[in-house]
Amino acid sequence: MTIAEIQQEILRMKKEQDICILAHAYQGQEILEVADYTGDSYGLSVQASKRDCSGVIMCGVRFMAETCKVLSPEKRVWLANPVAGCPMAEQLDLEGLRELKAQYPDYAVVAYINTTSELKTECDVCVTSSSAVEICKKLEQDKILFIPDPNLGHYVAEKLPEKTFAFYKGGCPRHIVVSAKDVEKARAAHPDALFLVHPECRQEVVEQADYVGSTTGIMEFAKKSEHKEFIIGTENSIVEHLQFECPDKKFYPVAVQLTCMNMKVTTLMDIYNCLKGQGGEEIFLPKNIMEGAGRCIHRMVELGG
């Protein structure tokens, strides 16, 4: 079958089965075209509970599918490709978190959504890159242990100088490879371009940005801006998607190595096979995980909404 034929079959089967397809913005264009909703982690979290359907196929990584299941326990949820995991979500385990909590006993524990559901059971609230500042500001506690991404944590801390932060030494393996030198090279090559960056990048990179925001924030800024050229400091799929949606503008990756292969493992055939009952992985979580992670995730939606 051609790509177009596979897409048509997916559209037909998802309608027949009352299935909603959610796709993270880092997925390929051919996947976004069959999705009912595309966006960043926060948008996917909200849509998971809002969508009126009997089942959800998540085209993203494991923690996203788990978050979807926690927010929609009555729905069947599948991860389109079972091997799609997030390295950052796996950097800190429960034992490591408990050791950190012992070091900072009077700190509120704020988890980036890029964490396992098990880890979320022992956190006060989780956040996304688009909601982190707002949620941390609303917390009653003045001391915050931010896990696992110190880059996003430092960005939030700069916005909230009235609060004290402690961090874990984690981070996104892709975003942290971007250096200030990469930015300098990109600006030299494209002197008229604005630099838009994700806060998962290192401080030295974020400090040079014309705009700092989540994946959705970056895309919305670029679409609405009167400017015509942009250097994009996040996963390189966003360059592709923005160029597709804004053909009158020019978009350049800040670094060629900013490609998340974990997101790229999901294919159209994964979705097709999942709908056929021949692929994907249905998500099941123990009751204690559903309840503990649910408390953390629902508080995120409550404070960030």
Residue spans for each PLM region:
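Active-site loop-to-helix "anion-binding N-cap" substructures in soluble metabolic enzymes
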Residues: 1-232, 238-305
